[in-house]
């Protein structure tokens, strides 16, 4: 979990490289969802993405209060299913549980990534629609 500004800024810079590729992003709306452990990073990502002219569909959570991560992974899947967006970002403490929850849905191809190269390759070569 990235919690300080230096790491958050680095993450946002890497995210910009990943999502700047025109053929990678076909729509400009990105769905964001997180559990309580991911809330601080999600809040930073919202500001960054808004500054890059992305539309944001925020599915929560909106506080540090403890919540069940599967609820937010499932909400992401439903948002992709009903067409609110084609891509999304999930954030939790490790990324593992929320990715597993989202991947239960046929239309979700969530990849757990740790760096810009992994994220970029997941999008370009594996057609991941959620990172």
Spans of features found by a protein language model:
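C-terminal binding/interaction regions
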Residues: 37, 116-131
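Compact, glycine-rich, soluble single-domain proteins
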Residues: 90-108
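A short beta-strand-loop structural module common to alpha/beta enzyme folds
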Residues: 55-66
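Glycine-rich phosphate/diphosphate-binding loop of Rossmann-like nucleotide-binding domains
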Residues: 31-50
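Short, structured active-site "lid" loops
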Residues: 72-90, 94
């Amino acid at each position: 979990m990235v919690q300080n500004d230096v790491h958050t800024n680095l993450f946002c810079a890497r995210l910009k490289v990943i999502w700047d590729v025109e053929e990678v992003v076909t729509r400009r709306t990105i769905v964001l969802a997180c559990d309580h452990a991911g809330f601080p990073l999600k809040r930073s990502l919202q500001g960054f993405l808004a500054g890059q002219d992305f539309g944001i569909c925020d599915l929560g959570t909106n506080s540090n209060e403890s919540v069940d991560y599967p609820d937010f992974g499932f909400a992401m899947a439903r948002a992709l299913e009903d067409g609110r967006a084609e891509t999304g970002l999930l954030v939790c403490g490790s990324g593992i549980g929320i990715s597993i929850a989202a991947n239960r849905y046929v239309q979700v191809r969530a990849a757990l990534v740790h760096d810009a190269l992994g994220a970029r390759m997941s999008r370009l070569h594996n057609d991941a629609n959620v990172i």
